[in-house]
């Protein structure tokens, strides 16, 4: 019923006006913040240099109680010169992270925002308190309460992360050096997910614990050579690299709890389910580089690398890639250029080929073992993704050219880069027909082309001993085109949303496009074709929009006064589109302003005039009773009775009415729950934004202060 201010009994039992609640959704939100505080101390002597730092990060979410993150990081770096020929670099970083209530996004049943689309518009947040009774059961609101979800659905995880590496540099001769490096990346994580008993949709409750351990070893050896002969400078290197990654996770879960409000595996009302997860990959490589320079104005570079990855089939496990580049420093070539106005100018160009592998366990399909069917009957379930043992490594070839300039004693700088990239055998996952027994498939997708440019401008408008103001502006534009797809396909579907729109990769179009699955059918004049009931017919899937922006950019400014520096950064995106499932779901649930269309007219016809028959809605009389099709219009057809589609005409399948203007009205519940979703443009939004991404304040402690405490 319309909310026209009538006095009604509220959900708390008190009288209230039936009017939309101001700040209906915004009252749940708050401004989210992320605070970063860091301090570092450096000291250097003739043989030892050391830097010690600490960073504290605290952040929250736009919803109170979600994504409460605390991260403390300690890092130390030291270089020790043992002899004239030998030095050692030591790096270490320890991070402890604690996150309470990571948020769930989109249409997850744990996302409080998703439930807002089911809430009556006269409801206030205050009416949701208390959210449960003395027995722990939710109050009878007849919908999922976001307040319940914020208070009765929790999760937490803690992570310890260690990064460490040691590098040994040994000068074999004046021109020949050896570098050995070993690095460790290790983290340990444990946490839980909890859904209390009596949660709507899961009255039994849910609890899960997990522990994770991951480590990655990296070893590298490189021999480098640098030599100068008169006007020539030569540098070359050869090396090898090995990575060894291992991940293990143990999960324990109960799907039925014995009692509410008790977060523990011992609170088990049925059977504990436990299962492991495993991930591992090894990768080895050999590589070489060479660079030749002449008189500091021309440089030529060549690189080559061969990788072997355990994630690929044995026949395709090895892949080689290389790069070639040349650059000209014009200011070194033409010495007569005044340095006061052009201090540096370089033209560069390069060609490169880069290879890439995939993740763990993407080659062979397996089955999961279960024993809970009909008591203790064992059964096996296949994976949802169809894998393939014929995967090839991805390959990207690129051409790049650019210009770098610095002016006015480096007070201004300009950089321009143009690139053109072709990626072949891109490894992607696509949804497939369920008749195959799988929901999605992994394969090499074909060829994709990217080209575009990036421009960077930097200026220092003001600088003296105590003050300095810097401004850096960046702008980039990327274009893409799908040149071909695997097995001659015209398109592949990445995902489908609400059976209404799809994200597709389509031959001849930008890399990712939005498509409407069953759009309104139209004729050659663009008029919507409807059936006898006035509802639009479904046509063939059509292109909606590209998700790619027209251009992106950023503006960073910094102001220094003595040792104090303030900086801020704007992030810019212009163009591209998003399809809002929130807007779609809100309209389908009759909660959006958009879905008010036709509602009052329908209620007047249905409740006041009692037009329960369909004649008034159809707007026409049965053609078989009216020989002249032009005289069969219902006498009250023009009065709005719901929703209609402007300019729509009857389809050729409607006897006696083909091509005539549609006289029918659609009941709002039919239109907004079924028909509107087929008109993808209704929920399409511009993805452009300008946002303040970062604000920072830094202070360099004067050296004479540190000397007093021994640094």
Q: Predicted segment positions?
A:
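Residues embedded in well-ordered regular secondary structure
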Residues: 1-66, 103-106, 131-156, 169-171, ...
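Surface-exposed, extracytoplasmic segments of Gram-negative outer-membrane nutrient-acquisition systems
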Residues: 5-17, 377-384, 422-445, 480-547, ...
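Acidic/polar loop-and-plug regions of large Gram-negative outer-membrane beta-barrel proteins
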Residues: 15-16, 95, 100-161, 214, ...
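Predominantly transmembrane beta-strands of Gram-negative outer membrane beta-barrel pores used
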Residues: 28-29, 36-59, 75-81, 89-91, ...
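Extracellular/periplasmic, surface-exposed regions of secreted and cell-surface proteins
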Residues: 35, 77-86, 91-96, 137-195, ...
């Amino acid at each position: 019923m319309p909310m026209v201010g009538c006095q009604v009994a509220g959900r708390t039992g008190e009288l209230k006006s039936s009017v939309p609640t101001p700040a209906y959704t915004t009252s749940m939100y708050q401004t989210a913040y992320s605070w970063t505080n860091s301090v570092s101390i450096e000291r250097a002597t003739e043989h030892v240099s050391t830097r010690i730092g600490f960073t504290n990060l605290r952040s929250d979410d736009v919803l109170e109680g979600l994504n409460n993150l605390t991260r403390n990081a300690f890092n130390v770096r030291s270089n020790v010169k043992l002899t004239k020929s030998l030095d050692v670099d030591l790096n270490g970083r320890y991070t402890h992270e604690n996150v309470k209530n990571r948020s769930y996004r989109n249409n997850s049943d744990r996302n409080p925002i998703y439930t807002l689309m089911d809430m009556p518009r006269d409801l206030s947040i205050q009416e949701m308190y208390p959210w449960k009774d003395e027995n722990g059961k939710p109050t009878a609101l007849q919908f999922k309460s976001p307040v319940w979800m914020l208070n009765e659905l929790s999760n937490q995880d803690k992570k310890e992360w260690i990064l460490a590496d040691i590098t040994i540099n040994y000068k074999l001769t004046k021109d020949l050096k050896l570098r050995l490096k070993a690095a460790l990346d290790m983290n340990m994580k444990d946490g839980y997910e909890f859904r209390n008993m009596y949660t709507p949709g899961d009255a039994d409750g849910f609890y899960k614990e997990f522990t994770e351990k991951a480590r990655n070893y990296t070893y590298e050896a490189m021999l480098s050579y640098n030599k100068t002969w008169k006007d020539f400078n030569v540098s070359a290197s050869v090396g090898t690299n090995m990575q060894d990654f291992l991940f293990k996770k143990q999960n324990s879960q109960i799907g039925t709890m014995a009692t509410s409000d008790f977060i523990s595996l011992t609170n088990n009302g049925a059977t504990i389910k436990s299962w492991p997860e495993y991930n591992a990959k090894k990768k080895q490589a050999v590589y070489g580089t060479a660079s030749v320079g002449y008189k500091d104005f021309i440089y030529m570079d060549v690189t080559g690398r061969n990788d072997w990855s355990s994630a690929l089939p044995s026949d395709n496990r090895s892949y080689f890639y290389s790069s070639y580049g040349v650059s000209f420093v014009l200011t070194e070539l033409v010495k007569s250029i005044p340095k006061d106005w052009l201090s540096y100018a370089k033209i560069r160009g390069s060609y490169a080929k880069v290879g890439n592998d995939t993740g763990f366990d993407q080659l062979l399909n397996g089955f999961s073992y279960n024993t809970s069917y009909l008591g203790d009957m064992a059964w096996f379930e296949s994976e949802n993704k169809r894998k393939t043992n014929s995967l090839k490594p991805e390959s990207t070839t690129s051409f790049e050219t650019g210009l770098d300039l610095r002016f006015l004693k480096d007070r201004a700088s300009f950089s321009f880069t143009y690139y053109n990239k072709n990626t072949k055998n891109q490894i992607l996952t696509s949804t497939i027909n369920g008749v195959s027994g799988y929901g999605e498939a992994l394969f090499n997708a074909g060829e994709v082309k990217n080209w575009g440019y990036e421009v960077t401008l930097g200026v220092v408008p003001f600088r003296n001993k105590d003050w300095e103001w810097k401004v850096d502006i960046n702008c980039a534009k990327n274009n893409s085109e799908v040149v071909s797809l695997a097995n001659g396909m015209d398109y592949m579907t990445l995902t489908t949303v609400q059976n209404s729109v799809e994200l597709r990769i389509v031959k001849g179009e930008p890399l990712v496009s939005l498509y409407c699955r069953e759009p309104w059918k139209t004729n050659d004049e663009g008029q919507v074709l409807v059936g006898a009931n006035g509802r639009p017919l479904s046509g063939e899937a059509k292109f909606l929009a590209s998700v790619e922006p027209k251009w992106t950019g950023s503006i960073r400014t910094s102001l220094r006064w003595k040792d104090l520096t303030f900086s801020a950064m704007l992030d810019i995106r212009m163009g591209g589109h998003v399809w809002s499932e929130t807007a779609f779901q809100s309209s389908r649930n009759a909660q959006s302003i958009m879905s008010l269309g036709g509602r009052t007219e329908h209620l007047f016809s249905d409740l006041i005039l009692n037009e329960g028959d369909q004649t008034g809605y159809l707007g026409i009389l049965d053609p078989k009773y009216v020989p002249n099709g032009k005289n069969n219009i219902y006498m009250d057809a023009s009065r709005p009775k719901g929703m209609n589609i402007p300019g729509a005409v009857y389809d050729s399948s409607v006897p006696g009415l083909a091509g005539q203007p549609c006289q029918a009205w659609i009941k709002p519940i039919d239109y907004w729950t079924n028909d509107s979703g087929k008109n993808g443009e209704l929920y399409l939004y511009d993805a452009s934004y300008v946002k303040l991404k970062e604000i920072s304040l830094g202070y360099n402690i004067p050296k004479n202060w540190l000397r007093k405490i021994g640094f």
